[in-house]
Amino acid sequence: MRLLPILLLLALPVHAVEPSLQVLSYHDVKDYVAGDYDPDQYAVSTGNLIAQFTFLRDNGFHPVSVDDVIAAYDGRRPLPANAVLLTFDDGMESFYTRVYPLLKLFKYPAVISVVTSWIESDVVLEYAGKKRVSADFLTWDQLRE
């Protein structure tokens, strides 16, 4: 008889938590970053990005596309549990050489945001404390691919 209250509690419906969306935002990816951590606040090492992608895969996270997010917002289909939107800002050249191959390998969708005036231009700008030129950013051909 003492088990009855416990059994009744276990029989109560559990309120489902609506799927949420986590957003991971990246800027630059470098092949090598000295030390055990990434001291450049705007960059992650290629090795750490692989470790993060592996963590997502091995721990039940589901990278989603912008179309998935819009469809969920419009009520057409829900997001999966543990939805993650991967974003890469500023259109750094490393997106093409380091990130894009990893996205294909893991079969992960992603969003890339570019500053079009930085692409194939003569502009020299300061970015993350360094002078940057157009070669540091994606080209139009790379973006089309």
Where are these predicted regions, by residue range?
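Short intrinsically disordered, low-complexity coil segments enriched in acidic
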Residues: R2-L3, E145
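Short polar catalytic/cofactor-binding loops
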Residues: Y26-D31
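Active-site beta->alpha N-cap acidic-glycine motif
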Residues: E18-L21, V33-E145
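Sec-dependent N-terminal signal peptides
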Residues: L3-V14
